[in-house]
Regions:
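N-terminal signal peptide c-region/cleavage motif recognized by signal peptidases
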Residues: 17-21
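Boundary of Sec targeting at the N-terminus
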Residues: 23-25
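Structural beta-strand segments of beta-rich domains
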Residues: 251-255
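Hydrophilic extracytoplasmic domains
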Residues: 256, 261-367
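Bacterial N-terminal signal peptides that target proteins for export
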Residues: 1-9
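Solvent-exposed N-terminal domain segments of exported/luminal and surface proteins
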Residues: 29-201
Length: 367
């Protein structure tokens, strides 16, 4: 009685396994890959808080709450500095020519037309693995004192808050949990041997106040496939400056800002101190999150998921109140981010027939 049942089960498993194997599509990496990072930064302050916000990267998929344009020349990876201005970083990879020294990016008339000159750096670390799209997060050092964690917008501190961690007695697991933050940051523009980038010492022109990415772009160079052409729509353009307003509201801090038509979501976080060795963290999330991993580029899927989880503020939100009593010590810093829409283009598109191998000529990520 048992033998036939086993035979049937094994036959079924074999059929499922063969079907799955038959449907597995061969996917090869693109012959050329480009990364384009876009950001707009501005300094922000709060009543009683020391200095402008923006010490850490507050990049968005289409720009941040931002200020005016820069002047003179700019350096590569300004999209990661938080310095006031409007920035674009570009990196190009050619698998046909791993030692590509320079390339050209044709750009629309509104963006330093007619072209950007990309130049590969010298004496830099080896390029990351082709399949390594994740940017590792650094482990935080063990702090001293206590941590007070608050979350949520509103005039008063909610019941059950703050969450307090005493670093003198907390376990490593408790500390890790306290600093836990959602994060889905992937690789973007970067510096590596054989990968030309812009800006660079040869071409470091700053963007004008009215610069725009919208329109046709094209890459060319030794080993770059012909026809590496694509359009960037308005959703991926530099965001306009956010006009952040703040006011005292009975001890709470009321924040409000203008709408951002291309924003996918918003997030606000603050860090402050109370006396010696006491740290205060607050975020606009409806659930506990230290927020440190969220102040960076995130994927569209992650942003949408965190909207459902009420971690991020909706794109129609234009205000948030920091509860009374959260920041009452020696000063604090506020950081805010508007997430735009990440654009991923691949040519040719993936074949619908799984039996046909997918061999892209080029791919580009704009965020």
């Amino acid at each position: 009685m048992n033998a036939p049942a086993k035979t049937i089960a094994l036959t079924t498993l074999a059929a499922v396994s063969l079907a799955a194997s038959a449907q597995q599509q061969v996917v090869k990496p693109p012959q050329a890959q480009a990364w384009i990072d876009v950001a707009t930064f501005s300094g922000m302050g709060m009543p009683g808080m020391g200095g402008p916000g923006g010490g850490n990267p507050m990049a968005s998929l289409g720009g941040l709450f931002g200020g005016g344009g820069a002047s003179g020349k700019v350096s590569f990876l300004m999209t990661q500095t938080g310095s006031t201005g409007r920035y674009v970083d570009v990196t190009l990879l050619s698998r046909r020519n791993p030692q590509l020294a320079e390339a050209t990016q044709d750009v629309p008339a509104g963006l330093l037309s007619p072209a950007l000159k990309l130049v590969a750096p010298r004496d830099v670390p080896q390029a990351p693995r082709d399949d390594d799209d994740v940017v590792p997060e650094r482990d935080p050092q063990r702090p001293q004192g206590k941590l007070f964690l608050y979350w949520g917008c509103g005039e008063t501190v909610r019941a059950g808050q703050p969450k307090v961690i005493d670093f003198a007695s907390a376990s490593a697991a408790e500390i890790a949990q306290a600093f836990q933050s959602r994060r889905a940051t992937q690789r973007g523009a970067h510096s590596a041997n054989g990968r030309p980038h812009w800006p660079n010492p040869t071409d470091g022109r700053a963007l004008a106040d009215g610069a725009s990415l919208v329109g046709g772009h094209a890459f060319s160079g030794n080993g770059v496939p012909e026809g590496f052409r694509f359009n960037i729509p308005a959703a991926q353009d530099l965001m306009p400056p956010m006009q952040l307003r703040q006011a005292d509201q009975g001890g709470a801090i009321a924040l409000s800002w203008n709408t951002q038509p291309s924003a996918r979501a918003f997030f606000v976080a603050g860090m402050g101190a109370r006396g010696r060795n006491e740290m205060v963290l607050w975020s606009s999330s409806e659930v506990p999150d230290a927020g440190m991993g969220l102040l960076d580029y995130q994927t569209n899927a992650a942003v949408d998921r965190w909207l459902r989880e009420r971690v991020l503020l909706t794109p129609t939100t234009t205000s948030c109140v920091v509860p009374k009593g959260v920041f009452v010590g020696e000063g604090a810093m506020l950081r805010a981010i508007a997430y735009g829409h990440e654009l991923n283009l691949v040519h040719p598109p993936r074949p619908s027939d799984p039996k046909v191998a997918w061999e892209p000529e080029w791919a580009v990520k704009v965020r």
